[in-house]
Amino acid sequence: MEGTFSMNGLIRRAVVAAISVVAMTGAIAAPANAGILTASAKDCGDESLSQPFAQFGDKAQYKLVQGADFEGSMDDWTLLGGAKVVAGNESWQVGGSSDNKSLVLPAGSSVITPASCVGLAEPTVRFFAKKNSGLLSTLAVSVYVKTSLGLVVPVPVGVVLGNGQWKANGPMLIVANLLPLLPGDRTPVAFQFTPLLGSWQIDDVYVDPFRYK
């Protein structure tokens, strides 16, 4: 687990620096050569897996990103621009009937998760989201990966649309699964959520580490 914790700090520092550049340029650039994103992690540790999206027809096994139910500690999260935990859970309470919190992302804010380990076989990220304001607002999702050269780089994952109600976002493919990792390798990644032209809430962020069928 030490590798995961050290990766948390490395990714967090690199991401904050990257966001400072983004704030000045107004855009997130994808790495010029995604083929060099080959760093793997051998010490990611075991995780507790569940099927939080089974009621939506998704029987895959997922693990909760550290703290991503927003019910406890937010250690190792990076909250920027007014992002904060608020009362109000996603409607299905997949994490438990006592869950009653989520993360609000005002316009101009952003959040970066702690590092989570994923494998080669089609890893995906899935979560709940709700648009609070902005007719044309969307929620941008990126993943930060450490390359074989030791660089932490952002790779866009996708954009979420909303209609003012909580919804279980469909599985989003993590670009890291296209990288030339060896079978059995695992690599730590961190996710960034950024609202565009409005305010959003997110809750219960899960990763499918091995894409179980």
Task: Show the residue positions of the predicted features.
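Bacterial N-terminal signal peptides that target proteins for export
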Residues: 4-18
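Extracellular beta-strand-rich recognition modules
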Residues: 70, 123-131, 187-195
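Exposed low-complexity, polar/acidic, P/S/T/G-rich flexible segments that act as propeptides
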Residues: 197-213
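Extracellular carbohydrate recognition and processing domains
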Residues: 56, 60, 148-186, 194-201
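Extracellular glycan-recognition surfaces and repeat-rich motifs
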Residues: 36-41, 48, 52-57, 63-102
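Extended, low-complexity, turn-rich repeat/linker tracts enriched in Gly/Pro/Ser/Thr and Asp/Glu
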Residues: 78-80, 106, 117-122, 130-139, ...
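Short beta-strands within extracellular/lumenal beta-sheet-rich domains
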Residues: 98-124
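C-terminal segment of classical bacterial N-terminal signal peptides
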Residues: 24-32
